[in-house]
Amino acid sequence: MQNLYSKFNSLINKKKTLLGVGPMSLNVIDSSIELSDFYKAPIMLIASRRQIDSSIYGGGYVNNWSTSQYSKYVRKKTKSGNIYLARDHGGPWQNNLDIKNKISEKDAMLSAKKSFENDIDNDFNFIHIDTSIDIHKKINLHSNMNDEKSS
């Protein structure tokens, strides 16, 4: 962890951009790895749970990969070691299976926890926790917050 922190601190001090790429397809993943290796530049592959997820949650739409398959592929393919795996929008109800089955809040939290554990076990470097979805509650995004306070 200290090594990772030192690398990113160095990039920040050099005012270098850290590019994050959504792994939308095998071509995007391979191209990102190729560019990272060629230019010796760090690139984060930032996968949502819909793109890549644990096999117990049906994997993801990218190559039908589970978290483990995805991590193994990327780690084997990269030569420079400058590819960082990141989870984007990890959290409850962030995969299609949880939404389709309309699972309870408790089960959604357990699903997110197991997915995060799988990310950690498969060498993900960054995890974005997103708790913004609640399929059981309707939120009016167009309401004025001041109107709600006065009610």
Regions found by a protein language model. Name each.
Residues 1-87, 94, 101-108, 115, ...:
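Alpha/beta catalytic barrel-like cores
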Residues 91-151:
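Helix-rich catalytic cores of soluble enzyme domains
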